[in-house]
Amino acid sequence: MGTIVLELDGTHAPITTANFLRYVDQKRLDGTTIYRALNFGDGGGLIQGGTRGNPKRILPPIAHEPTTTTGLSHVAGTVSMTRFTPGTANGDFFILASDIPQLDADPSQPGDNVGYAAFGHVVEGMDIVKRIVAMPTSPTEGEGAMRGQMLAAPVKIISVRRSN
């Protein structure tokens, strides 16, 4: 499909950036897939990919860096780490095709209000992100809130490398 180039923000999100770079440097993302697409129907949404819990690929989880600490926000092009609960992020990430401010930390909200750890943004390849968002999903694949969001044909990540 093409190349997506990310610029990571190690100044504002040092823990999350270092974690992602460990996966890059150890080539743990090579051969994985973009396996999920949440399509809002208006060109917006997100794509998700990475290790998908493969025990041969995952590294220990990292501390959570909420957007209230980093000052980053979930706008179109943001790359962020997936997690179950705070402190469980490892080798899966998502990229936003549109602004989704609900993914930012919001301490005024009840429940799980710490958001997701944004740590960079797309500088090249947003057209590819949007093409993946628009790809067909399986109506039966996925569990819970992700049912129906799993790509019918996941997109292979050939390699992930530092550019300099």
Predicted regions and their residues:
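Cyclophilin-like peptidyl-prolyl cis-trans isomerases
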Residues: 1-164
